[in-house]
């Protein structure tokens, strides 16, 4: 996590490389620290240093279309594109091989309920980024998909409604077309929530109440298979592997490794990736 004047550290990067992994860093900070465009250059310098230290990929901020992650009243894709431009310039000047991923917006249709001071629908936000020229300052478009309750092979049939964020194809088509089909997608979070093995899901996550662990495992494998064969998804990170928190934000319900230590998704993903 960045904060003004914080020096970049290579500890995570070195540790990952020593273990034979590449490392993608999603770099965010406190919304108050960027209010009014303050400290954009400080942030850009920080991510540039991470690139110099060997980061293989950097996601520039996170879910900047909601006021939990960006200052309320200032949510604007043009403003974010300015931060992205400065960051991209610094990153590429320090390490041209570092993959630059735009921050993935929160999938949402809530702007009508809460107002644009607090949230922008992600389709509007992504379109605004494209109009502001963000495509010139990214290697890959960041995407989050975390509210599915049906197979990613389906583009209809969600019992809630037909809103595009419900569907894997809806998210892919929306984000890919926003940049004129010219930029590949990077899923920095893709997961399916199952409360199986836990107490009841919090009420605001009740939409996933009927999703089983077996369905989670099947759908993750299907999503990876579709992404690999599509030619338009460069990277996909499963959210998540082994989180255990299960409070008002039930991250443990997204975990592949379940409370009983079983991991059905490990087996399905092993099959679809050919053992990699």
Regions flagged by a language model, labelled:
Residues 7, 64, 75, 197, ...:
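Aromatic-rich peripheral "rim/lid" segments of glycoside hydrolase catalytic domains that contact
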Residues 17, 35-63, 73-94, 117-139, ...:
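An active-site-proximal structural segment forming one wall of the substrate-binding cleft
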Residues 46-77, 98-109, 136-152, 185-190, ...:
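Active-site groove signature of glycoside hydrolases
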């Amino acid at each position: 996590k960045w904060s003004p004047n914080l020096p970049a550290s290579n500890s995570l990067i070195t540790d990952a490389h020593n273990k034979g992994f590449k490392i993608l860093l999603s770099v965010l900070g406190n919304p108050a620290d960027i209010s009014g465009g303050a400290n954009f250059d400080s942030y850009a310098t920080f991510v540039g240093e991470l690139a110099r230290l060997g980061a293989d990929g950097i996601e520039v901020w996170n879910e900047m279309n909601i006021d939990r992650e960006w200052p309320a009243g200032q949510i604007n894709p043009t403003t974010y594109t300015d931060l992205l431009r400065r960051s991209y310039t610094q990153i590429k000047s320090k390490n041209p091989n570092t993959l630059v991923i735009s921050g993935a917006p929160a999938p949402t249709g809530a702007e009508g309920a809460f107002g644009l001071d607090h949230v922008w629908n992600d389709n509007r936000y992504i379109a605004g980024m494209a109009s502001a020229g963000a495509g010139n300052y990214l290697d890959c478009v960041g995407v989050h998909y975390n509210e599915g309750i049906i197979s990613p092979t389906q583009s209809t049939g969600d019992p809630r409604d037909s809103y595009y964020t419900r569907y894997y194809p809806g998210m892919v088509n929306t984000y890919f077309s926003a940049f004129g089909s010219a930029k590949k997608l990077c899923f920095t979070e893709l997961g399916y929530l199952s409360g199986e093995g836990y107490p009841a899901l919090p009420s605001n996550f009740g939409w996933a109440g009927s999703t089983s662990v077996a369905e989670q495992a099947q759908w993750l494998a299907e999503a990876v298979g579709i992404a690999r064969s599509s030619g338009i998804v460069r990277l996909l990170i499963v959210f998540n592997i082994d989180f255990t928190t299960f409070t008002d934000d039930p991250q443990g319900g997204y975990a592949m490794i379940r409370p009983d230590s079983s991991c059905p998704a490990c087996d399905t993903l092993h099959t679809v990736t050919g053992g990699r």
